[in-house]
């Protein structure tokens, strides 16, 4: 069963200011939590298009929401192809788009997907099971320098060099095949006092490898720009991020698109190309409530930002 506790459910969907007959996009279908709440607010004229790379998520949602008929459309695709895929089904503009950038719990909890450092499994970490690059390829084929870079940039891991050295030395004799082997090497690369603080010692490196395998930051940056272009004036974009790298991209993109650039003084009117595209709905991110944090530990790092097209 595809079970997943949706984070910031009401805040994210309500933040889109739903029009009952509007057209909306859920870029991250997952377990269908946001989609379910959004669909419940649409009338017969409304429509929801939901993206996911995961075939299991798509099939589950088709069954779950079959009663909505043509109001609910699934697209099995990475959301980096948002504009193209919508155009393929005749949609050129929408009333709202949401992103929930957390890895869905079923992916984390299915050991053979290789996302979790709590289960021993083959090194995979692909969101899209048809994609060519796996965690095995990254860990066994990428150079010491490349590993240091991703561990530091994507995982903000202080002991990136030490961990990369352990990986480099180990794979000279044998390929690193499982998450369990990788966890042990990470632990060896982190000094004992540091291992005892800040959560699981493998957390940051696993995050870094997952981001690299799925090219997550570049994909999100491109998709967010596409979303801003595709939303109608008055429409909104809601984004839930789970770590500082994603949040920085969202914050920077929203700020850049909601700010008027420096113009020469004395211009009678501001040319259209210099007018801000967005109005910020959230100056500061919305965080989960204490009640939600008690019920769902995975919500603790979630941040929600919302912007409206001018």
Curated annotation (Swiss-Prot):
Specifically methylates the N4 position of cytidine in position 1402 (C1402) of 16S rRNA. The keyword NAD does not apply. Keywords: Cytoplasm, Methyltransferase, rRNA processing, S-adenosyl-L-methionine, Transferase. It comes from Bacillus cereus (strain ATCC 14579 / DSM 31 / CCUG 7414 / JCM 2152 / NBRC 15305 / NCIMB 9373 / NCTC 2599 / NRRL B-3711). One of its GO terms (cellular component) is cytoplasm. This is Ribosomal RNA small subunit methyltransferase H. GO terms for molecular function: rRNA (cytosine-N4-)-methyltransferase activity. The gene is rsmH. Signal peptide: none annotated.
């Amino acid at each position: 069963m595809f079970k997943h506790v949706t984070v910031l459910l009401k805040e994210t969907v309500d933040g889109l200011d739903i029009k009952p007959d509007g057209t909306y996009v859920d870029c991250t279908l997952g377990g269908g939590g946001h989609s379910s709440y959004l669909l419940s607010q649409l009338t017969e004229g409304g429509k929801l298009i939901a993206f996911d790379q995961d075939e299991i998520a798509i099939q589950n949602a088709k069954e779950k929401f079959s009663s909505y008929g043509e109001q609910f459309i699934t697209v099995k695709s990475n959301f980096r192809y948002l504009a193209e895929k919508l155009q393929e089904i005749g949609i050129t503009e929408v009333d709202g788009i949401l992103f929930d950038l957390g890895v869905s719990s079923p992916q984390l909890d299915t050991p053979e997907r290789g996302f979790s450092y709590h289960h021993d499994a083959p090194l995979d970490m692909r969101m899209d099971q048809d994609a060519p690059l796996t965690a095995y390829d990254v860990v066994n084929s990428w150079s010491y320098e490349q590993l240091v870079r991703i561990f530091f940039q994507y995982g903000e891991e202080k002991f990136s060099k030490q961990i990369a050295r352990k990986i480099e030395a180990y794979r000279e004799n044998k390929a690193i095949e499982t998450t369990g082997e990788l966890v042990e090497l990470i632990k060896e690369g982190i000094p004992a006092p540091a291992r005892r603080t800040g959560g699981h010692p493998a957390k940051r490196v696993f995050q870094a490898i997952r981001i690299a395998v799925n090219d997550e930051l570049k994909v999100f940056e491109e998709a967010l720009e596409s979303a801003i272009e595709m939303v109608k004036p008055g429409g909104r974009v809601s984004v839930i991020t789970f770590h500082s790298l994603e949040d920085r991209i969202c914050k920077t993109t929203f700020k850049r698109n909601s700010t008027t650039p420096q113009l020469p003084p004395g211009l009678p009117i501001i040319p259209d190309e210099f007018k801000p595209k967005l109005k910020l709905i959230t100056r500061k991110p919305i965080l989960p409530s204490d009640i939600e944090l008690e019920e769902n530990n995975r919500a603790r790092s979630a941040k929600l930002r919302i912007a409206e097209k001018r």
